[in-house]
Amino acid sequence: MPKMKTNRGAAKRFKKTGSGRIKRGKAFTSHILTKKSTKRKRSLRQADLVSSADVKNIKKILPYM
């Protein structure tokens, strides 16, 4: 059985926490920031956990995570 390939784009976007859950960064932070409030931009800096509905698909494209 050959090795499974890791999706490199996904590998750069997701990390595993100590408890085994999957961490992700938030979207809407790269440009057009002037119209977004300071409070909104500050909350977008915080990492978030992947939804339970998406975990199965993430684990499929990241087999060694």
UniProtKB/Swiss-Prot annotation:
One of its GO terms (molecular function) is structural constituent of ribosome. GO terms for biological process: translation. The gene is rpmI. It comes from the Bacteria. Keywords: Ribonucleoprotein, Ribosomal protein. Residues 1-29 are annotated as: Disordered. Belongs to the bacterial ribosomal protein bL35 family. This is Large ribosomal subunit protein bL35. Pfam families: Ribosomal_L35p (PF01632). PROSITE patterns: RIBOSOMAL_L35 (PS00936). The lineage of its organism: Bacteria, Pseudomonadati, Thermodesulfobacteriota, Desulfobulbia, Desulfobulbales. One of its GO terms (cellular component) is cytosolic large ribosomal subunit. InterPro entries: Ribosomal_bL35, Ribosomal_bL35-like, Ribosomal_bL35_CS, Ribosomal_bL35_sf. Residues 10-26 have a biased composition (Basic residues).
